[in-house]
Amino acid sequence: MIDQVLADWAPVTIATVVICFLADYVLTHLGAQAARGVRDRWSIEGSYEMNPTWERQIDSGRWFSWRVLFVAASLAVLLGAVRLLVQPGLFGLGPAFFGFAAGLILLLQAPVLIAHATNLQTFRDLADPTAVQGGLHFRRWYVYRQGASYVLRFGILWLLLWIPSQQAFFIGGAVSCLLWARRMAQLGEAARPSAPETMELGLGAPEDATPAASTIP
């Protein structure tokens, strides 16, 4: 039983959550640096970071941030508190409650880390001048929509895995992925220009566009 194992090994589960969060942060910085090196071949408008909450932090190029440490510590404390709630005889909550909480974070981070790995490999390949001819510039709304579709597929996968397993871990992942996909879709709609504005913009990429990748930190 996945939920039971996660609860029994709560310290390992909590450490994994924190490590995944920090890995996401580090890989986002690495991706932003790599993207700048291939901006003449591949770029999108706006920030490399697709989560508005972290855009300024990534754009600043500063690696150290008390905010990052605060979020990492908060995740550990919250999951630790949830684990205490599922102790036998307390509040009547079973290990499924902890499994759900762990799934909310870990199964959202899974597609995010996969996207980071894909982006870094793409930028490495594009660093070869013979890899492509010309360049491609993506509008931000389109990348948001692609990100929403990407995370949605994982949400459906976790839901399908829950059906035979009946483990709350997968329900947690499905909930977080579906909610994040909805958020990305909303951001995409907000960023999409009107039809007349789109015609005025033309096909060229703006010179001041910041390279980015479809990451979901």
Where are these regions (language model features)?
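Hydrophobic alpha-helical segments at protein termini of multi-pass membrane proteins
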Residues: 2-217
